Amino acid sequence: MSLPPLTLTRRLLPLGLVFLAAGLSLALVGPFLALFLSTSVDAGPVKVTVFLVVGPLAGVATSWAIGRVSDRRPMRRHLLIIASIAGVIGCGLAAVIRDYWALLALTTTAFAVAGALFPQTFAYAREVLQRDDPGRAALGISALRTVFSLAYVGGPPIAALLLSHGGFTAVFATAAVMYALATLVAFGWLSEVEAPAAPEGDQPPPVPAPAASRIRIWLTVAAFTLMQAPMVLGVQALALFIEHDLHGSVGDAGLILGLCAALEIPLMLGLGLLTRRISVRALILAGSACGVIYSAIVFGAPAVWVLLAAQIVNALYIASVSSLGITYVQDMMPAEPGRATTLFTNTFPIGQIMAGPLLGLAQHTDYRWAYAMNFVMCLLGVLLLLATRPAARVSTLRLRRARASGADVPAGDRRPA
């Protein structure tokens, strides 16, 4: 039976604090990592590039391994604690270490383990929501994703303030404190989500939702990767495109990015509410189509004001893919929330790696062509999602009755997922 809304809100409150702390940690460090390496560590362009590629790859591999283990037994709370402690260790050491190779070792160990905090917290939230209020699972995930976005709104300005007063030592030390807060919340406030209790008496066991086929899962992951890369490339190329092609200023780029971020947050919540009336798949397809439209608009934009006007389309694209994509992949793998969430969250660092060489290609041609490449990637992503139409599934009620009586399931009871 579903819990009252207030009880469920209280249940998600500690998860919201974990997301806020983890989000602030990443938002403090991430935007200034290249600056840290080039100024405080004296790393050259090649070393910076290697660091920025090896770090995400190590995070992807570690999160994947932890995601597979996490679904085998009730241990997700312990994994949240371990990942948070790894973040404390990584940021604490980075506050004082200035040797490139030592930092590279840190990013492939402690920071890679800390990266599992994001997907594992979403997986924990999924288990709680599915147990307590399945009808609001997508809304709950969207709300938590919004908290993470809020952290990224406040994180960079806080980091800039810390840099001006205490340098990178203060930045990494503050990030370590945030991870410590996440550790305390996970240790003292969260409980392990146990497996569903066995039914009593002659009641038939609940019928688990079938997982999607392996090919459909991997095609869906490929689609989301193709739609994450344009988000990164679009941001990386924006200031350069505005300055070189539209003859605007860096301030114009900041205004556009700020407007988009401000629109994303209410849109994430609104899309979460819409999932109670419209399927997650339909909303994601519509949002992905917005990515195609936005890329086309920017490619043909004659002035900065066109980009400003198009941010509502861009925000719809980012909000739908970023917030609902997690729920969509989790729905495809209902028995493996940890692995499902990790599969989705890993699409972002892979998209980051893809965006780097594409930006270099745009530098040798024209920055406008970065958005032509975004158009192609978004279009391919939409086509892949359309190609992965869910297979027919069996009516759950009729399936239970048929299993209880030992009869075959009528073909007429099969319906699209």
Task: Please annotate each region the language model reported.
Residues 3-56, 223, 231-242:
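Helix-loop boundary and gating motifs at the non-cytosolic
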Residues 20, 101-118, 225, 306-320:
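Hydrophobic core of transmembrane alpha-helices in multi-pass small-molecule transporters
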Residues 37-38, 69-71, 161-165, 242-243, ...:
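Interfacial helix-cap and linker-helix signal at transmembrane-aqueous boundaries
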Residues 61-75, 163, 267-280, 363:
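Helix-to-loop junctions at the C-terminal end of transmembrane segments
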Residues 78-92, 173-176, 282-297, 375:
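Structural signature of the two symmetry-related core transmembrane helices
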Residues 115-131, 320-333:
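Intracellular juxtamembrane helix-capping segments at the cytosolic ends
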Residues 281-325:
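C-terminal transmembrane helical hairpin of 12-TM major facilitator-type secondary transporters
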Residues 335-365:
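A late C-terminal transmembrane helix in Major Facilitator Superfamily
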